A protein has these predicted regions:
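Structural scaffold elements adjacent to functional motifs in cytosolic proteins
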Residues: 58-60
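Rhodanese-like catalytic fold shared by cysteine-dependent sulfurtransferases
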Residues: 2-8, 15-16, 20-45, 50, ...
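Short, glycine/acidic-enriched loop or turn micro-motifs at the edges of active sites
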Residues: 63
Length: 140
């Protein structure tokens, strides 16, 4: 009887220890993902350099009217208000490098954080178009 109790205690201890190890491994993986998908704030100049040197998706999170009034060339319009609990259709690749901007920087920060929460891995906020010293394109 004593051997059975000892064996049961040993088995329970092993089960608890292995459960803790698995939980820690899962937590470490979640932390690694969070580190990879961190919020990045960059200047307009840094964003411009990124556009020139690598493949990026420029995301304008202003309204349609603001976008039509002048936007960065090749920018994709994804209004901040439209970013919810589902991945925006205009941004199908969660691994793409996204450069997010708005008018002043408030909406771009909010949008960048929402995109990170949706699982996008490489999101850079470069603030507002009011600080963009380069050319804008107008629709029409």
């Amino acid at each position: 009887m004593r051997q059975i109790l000892l064996f049961a205690a040993l088995a329970a201890s092993l089960a608890l220890l292995s459960g803790c190890t698995l939980s820690k491994a899962k937590a470490d993986t979640a932390e690694d993902m969070a580190d990879k998908a961190a919020y990045h704030k960059v200047s307009a100049e840094e964003a411009y350099e990124m556009m020139a040197s690598q493949e990026v998706v420029v995301v304008d999170v202003r309204t349609r009217e603001e976008y039509d009034g002048g936007h960065i060339e090749n920018a994709v319009l994804v209004p901040n208000e439209s970013i919810g609990s589902e991945m925006p259709e205009a941004l199908p690749d969660k691994e793409a490098t996204l450069l997010v901007y708005c008018r002043s920087g408030r909406r771009s920060k909010d949008a960048a954080q929402k995109l990170l929460a949706l699982g996008y891995q490489s999101v850079y906020d470069f603030g507002g178009v009011i600080d963009w010293p380069y050319e804008l394109v107008k629709e029409g």
